[in-house]
């Protein structure tokens, strides 16, 4: 729960965004951070992968749970933080600030998150639960089939 609150606080910078609700907020933040510099197709792929995980037993059953999934540690003062580089989505635990700076991309991410969550966008990923930038080669990527979207594979 603490992770979800930290995530929401970093994204809810406008009065309009404060009324989005946790699912839209978490998905929009994931789209922004994972694919903010990608095409609309890349952003949609990230959103669909996030939602596809919610529908599977092996992942948390909420969008925020999926986005913030990963091991955590607690400091002596009781603060909880994600373990660096051990999250499902690398931006969440890379040690960098998670504050959107591009309002146009942030607004587009919110718009797309709403569309995906309200079933108004076709899932062209065919139920994909993973993706990666084609400049990296994670160990999990070898035994799977791909759909290629410019810099991201799903």
Features from the language model and the residues they span:
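Sec-dependent signal peptide recognition
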Residues: 1-8
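Catalytic glycan-binding domains that act on GlcNAc-containing polysaccharides
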Residues: 14-146
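Conserved small/polar residues in nucleotide/adenosyl-binding loops
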Residues: 147-154
